[in-house]
């Protein structure tokens, strides 16, 4: 009887130890960095809507730090590059924002978010022909990103 209890306890402790080890893998920390960045961006957007631009920029800067680390750990993910471009653009660094967007498009040319945000960057930098090219990529997607970019282009 004591052997059964001891064996059962040992078995439970062993399983608990392996389940904790499974939670410390590299992939979860990569996702966590990305998730933290996305949360920072969401908070920054809310602050922008309230007119709190300086606080929003600080959130975007935090997001960039998380995204750069995430991109180093797991490079060439279009979604990460999209958010890097977005957050960088929102801090006023259009040149590097564009670089991130173009890297993302090289990986996933029809990425809806990148095409919309890159189009917005082109409008902000007075390159309307390039913005219209991004809009044409989105034309058949039947998505809100098309309408948003079209609204920005139409002014």
Name each region found by the language model.
Residues 77, 111, 143-146:
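Residue-level recognition of tetratricopeptide repeat
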Residues 73, 107, 138-141:
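Structural marker of alpha-solenoid helical repeat scaffolds
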Residues 24-32, 46, 130-155:
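Terminal, low-structured helical/coil segments at or just beyond the last alpha-helical repeat
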